[in-house]
Amino acid sequence: MATTRLLFLLVVAVMITMVRSATLHYNPTVINLDRGRPKLHIGMLTSWTNADNSQGTGFPSAGAFPLAIQYANNDMDILHGYDINFEWVDTHCDINLGMAAISDWWKRGFLGVIGPGCGCTYEGRLASALNFPMIDYACDENPVSNKEFYPTFLRTIPPSIQVVDSILLTLDMYDWNQVTVVVENITKYRNVFNTMKEQFDMREEWEILHEEYYAGFDPWDPDAAEPFTDIIQRTKKTTRIYVFFGDSGDLRQFAISALDVGILNSGDYAIVGAVIDLEIRDSQDYHSLEYTLEASDYLEQINQAYEQMFKLREYTRTDDERALEAMKSVLIVTGEPVLRSQAWHIYSAIVIDNALDEPFNGTLELKTDIDMASVYIFDATTELLKALDATLQAGGDMYDGSQVVSNLFNTSYRSKAKADYQFDENGDGVKSYVLLHRIPIPVGDGGMPPGSPGMYPIGTFVRAESGHWSFNKDPDLNPVWHNRDDPPLDMPVCGFHGELCTNWGLYLGTLIPAFIIIFGGGLGYYIYRKRAYEAALDSLVWKVDWKEVQTRESETNSQGFSMKSMVLSAISVISNAEKQQIFATIGTYRGTICAIHAVHKNHIDLTRAVRTELKLMRDMRHDNICPFIGACIDRPHICILMHYCAKGSLQDIMENDDIKLDSMFLASLIADLVKGLVYLHSSEIKSHGHLKSSNCVVDNRWVLQITDYGLHEFRKGQKEDVDLGEHAKLARKLWTAPEHLREGKSMHPGGTPKGDIYSFSIILTEMYSRQEPFHENDLELADIIARVSKGEVPPYRPVLNAVNEAAPDCVLTAIRACWVEDPMERPNIIEVRTMLAPLQKGLKPNILDNMIAIMERYTNNLEELVDERTQELQKEKAKTEQLLHRMLPPSIASQLIKGISVLPETFDMVSIFFSDIVGFLIHFSLSSCRLFCSSQVLPLLVPWLHSLLTLPLHLPLIWMNPLISSFAQPSWSALHSHSCSALHSS
């Protein structure tokens, strides 16, 4: 971006230098209107004369500029209250003069410029740098479409490359995918070809070849080398459709050359030409030069000049006849022609008069008719003034170029040509194109009577505001193809070299038997599958004989079902050793415990729709879909048997306070529910229709399964359950989507997937609040249902106070997305699964796997804990052994450590030292606290107090008489102070 800006500044600097060098030669012509009102000024650049003072391209079309100014000054709706004055400059197609005029007009406060009419990149870049509006009428350069560098530049003339869209539509219309493009080697037509080639390259099946002829070829010059014969000879064997990009006269000569080569006689070739110049032509102008001479009613010298020019080419009537014959195979795409009405002739005359009058003062030479440039000049002037008026009316700044031109982008206007033109998003002009074909003209044209052959429009190419082009064919006009009834093919049926038909005869004997075998096999397989399907429909594998269903014999309700086996009955399931609570009517069918769902009908008609439903139910197989066991149609036991899930429904679990639900538990149940809905919505059943927490059951493995799905035709027409109260009927609707509530009884029993998504959001609120839906809403059930179905803004939904505290953000986001009022704005179940993906982060697919993973982690931690506790136990054991050895004799301690019982012993003789505690303390308070250290005392003694009180406990062996002396000695020593512990008086 910085480099781009630097280049932009450099270009502007160069422009300023060029402007300064040209300022001395700048000579504008000023036209002022003074009616006593404020004056506004605009300028026009045109090439009135060439550098050699010969007549330029601006004559006589520039005469439309003062005419447009005059119309605006007289129009009460354009800049009312102002006089619009103008200046014009003859640039001679000199860039310096044009930029000098732009710079001067900008400094003098002009409001915009029309032109320059020649090259426009430098002038447009300068005007954009000055924020100065510029609308051109003849510029055909591609860079000016880039609004990053040319933000204030627009043009009423369509760029040449715009014709490519119409060319491609023509090729599409006739299925022409392979073409050879013949291009004049000049920038204008090379740009058109390159744009077309880019479109071809984007389509794999399209193929484009390319031929060029030299620039400046003059078909009227007898000395000019005719390039087309060689091109046609080189390409005719690999081409059927030619696309020609060159001048109109060159196209005429190319068609004549193709006729001379002989490729047009068979009708197998066609030419599509693009005529994108400024000339205004009649139906005869594309092929007949004689018509041009005879129809011209201008001055005599003009006819003489034309005749003199054509004599150089040795013109003969035969040329026109050959061109007319060649045009049978030519289609021409060109701009929508001007309606040659009386108003147009008046306009043309005024433009020419203006060109001959002040301020132009032109002279009448060879060219006496106006072209489309006059229309583009008139339109550019008018649209600029309208944009200024719109800016003024909006309170804007008319001197802000960007603000002024912003009123023109992507707008349509009525052109002076009496057709609807446009400015696109790049400020380029847009007009309609027509497809010309040689047919008998339906109306007189340019003096030729109806029925004369001519190139006449058979349809119009129109651009919509979206930028899309379409072809509007005239229903009354059809192309007349040369020597055939339909358009030619873009290649022969067998290819240009017969490659598409090679060896068909050789392989015919193999292909036909192979086809018969494949077709016969496919047909047989189809018949087999069809019969198998019909047999599956006719089979009664789903049918359950009520006699095979074992239920508890007790009183029954009106449908013949056991009343004691209804909801919340507490019986034991024989196949399960544990006591379990039963949450539905259950029975045993062929050894399988099943939930029995009564159908309140008197009989079942086994129509094809019912049998198809039963087959679909049998085919439903998924871990999170409750299996269908069968159906009983025996009166009065009409019912549906589903697999029984012992843990009950999700609603039962939510209401059971003994079951603690942590985040892992809830995440697992939600994941199961989502997986079940994904399978259900992708199956042929499509949707549940009555999804609620009571229809979500949990089996012994804590896997959630969806039940009560499908069989809508089977249940159709059943009576209401007489045992169901009014409150329960209303409570069932709390999960129903508002659009289904509004449908009432007309609701399809199967509902819709988006209705299931709404029900899913209500179930989520139950799971995280552990309460019934809408429990925090202070309204009766009937009022709640009425407000939900009403579709209020914002919609009435459950209060989420409890859910906000417990649920993670992803769940809250999913809830709010799933219960929006408009079903089309609700996510599908796949998108819901993505929303809730954070819940499953780090978790296994189901809750049992998660519990096993937790137990594995616990086991690993437990092993480490056991090792640690074992080491601590060993240390404590050692401490205990030491304590035992200190408290007990070694022999006794050893026996206890080994676990051997210590038996009591009997002694024949014992010596006991007696002393009361008081006397003992008084006596020994007079002694120092020392151990007995006499050699006569056994070293088994401990400190005095402990030793004297526990001496009998330390007898390791049975001693005889020495024992007496051993125990007597310390006693004697204590009494008589004969120990080495000196007694001292207090």
Swiss-Prot record:
PROSITE patterns: PROTEIN_KINASE_DOM
Protein's UniProt keywords contain Membrane: yes
Residue ranges that the UniProt entry lists as topological domain Cytoplasmic: 529-986
A GO molecular function held by the record: protein kinase activity
E.C. designation(s): 4.6.1.2
Pfam families, A to Z: ANF_receptor (PF01094), HNOBA (PF07701), PK_Tyr_Ser-Thr (PF07714)
Keyword line: cGMP biosynthesis, Glycoprotein, GTP-binding, Lyase, Membrane, Nucleotide-binding, Phosphoprotein, Receptor, Signal, Transmembrane, Transmembrane helix
Transmembrane segments: 508-528
Limits of the Protein kinase domain: 568-836
A GO CC term attached to the entry: plasma membrane
Entry's localization field: Membrane
Top-level taxon of the source organism: Eukaryota
Membrane topology: Single-pass type I membrane protein
Entry-listed glycosylation sites: 185, 361, 410
Signal found in the keyword field: yes
Gene Ontology process terms (BP): receptor guanylyl cyclase signaling pathway
Sequence ranges on the Extracellular membrane side: 22-507
Record InterPro entries: ANF_lig-bd_rcpt (IPR001828), Cyclic_nucleotide_synthase (IPR050401), HNOB_dom_associated (IPR011645), Kinase-like_dom_sf (IPR011009), Nucleotide_cyclase (IPR029787), Peripla_BP_I (IPR028082), Prot_kinase_dom (IPR000719), Ser-Thr/Tyr_kinase_cat_dom (IPR001245)
Enzymatic reactions: GTP = 3',5'-cyclic GMP + diphosphate
PANTHER family referenced in this protein's UniProt entry, alphabetically: GUANYLATE CYCLASE (PTHR11920:SF335), GUANYLYL CYCLASE (PTHR11920)
Role description: Implicated as a cell-surface receptor on spermatozoa for 'resact' a chemotactic peptide, and on various other cells as a receptor for atrial natriuretic peptide.
This protein's name: Resact receptor
